[in-house]
Regions:
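DNA-recognition helix of helix-turn-helix
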Residues: 68, 131, 137-161
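A short pre-motif secondary-structure segment
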Residues: 119-120
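A short, charge-rich alpha-helical start-of-domain segment used by transcription regulators
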Residues: 2-25, 35
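Internal acidic/polar
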Residues: 5, 73, 80-107, 129, ...
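Residue-level preference for hydrophobic side chains embedded in well-ordered alpha helices
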Residues: 15, 19, 23, 44, ...
Length: 174
């Protein structure tokens, strides 16, 4: 089948059905609200449709990259930092055990640079492999590994500054 037929409305419906909720979750983790995240997802998929000939086979990391750039443009235009997640955004199951630890991690994470936060979120929250995270960030896999290593070190250092902080490992390596 030639590429022209692969990038039709059926192709788009397929990637939309497969990845819409992932893109919304990506937005919720960065924006703190479902409505804003759904709006971001709509913008991401609009770009995907318009640039459908450029979308690689590994679609999800590419979609996250589009979302990342859309958010960066928005924050730059608004001259505001990315919003911190409120405690109310923490899933109910997490509220019972380890809530203080979760707050410590979120507080420390918020003190990191946007780039450090992004690599930790991509690997830890989004569960992307290093090569997928590299695609989102627009860098090589080796560079992404170094960024993750340094971000983990900085996060660990911040957590050690807090009282009774235990070591935390964000995400695995794939």
């Amino acid at each position: 089948m030639n590429v022209v037929h692969e990038r039709d409305a059926d192709w788009f419906r397929s990637i939309y059905a497969r990845h819409y909720q992932d893109v919304v979750r990506y937005g919720v983790r960065r924006l703190g609200g479902t409505a804003a995240a759904e709006e971001l997802a709509q913008e991401v998929f609009l770009v995907a449709w318009r640039r459908r000939w450029e979308v690689p086979a590994r679609t999800l990391p590419w979609l996250y990259g589009v979302g990342r750039r859309l958010l960066a443009n928005h924050w730059r235009a608004e001259r505001a930092a990315p919003p911190a997640l409120e405690l109310g955004d923490v899933p109910a199951a997490d509220r019972h055990d380890g809530i203080a630890r979760l707050v410590d991690v979120r507080t420390a994470l918020a003190r990191l640079s946007d780039d450090d936060q992004e690599i930790l979120r991509l690997v830890g929250w989004e569960q992307l492999s290093m090569s997928e995270a590299a695609l989102v960030l627009g860098c090589g896999t080796a560079t992404a590994k170094v960024r993750l290593h340094l971000a983990r070190r900085r996060l660990t250092a911040l957590l050690r500054e807090q009282p009774a902080a235990a070591p935390v490992r964000i995400g695995g390596t794939r």
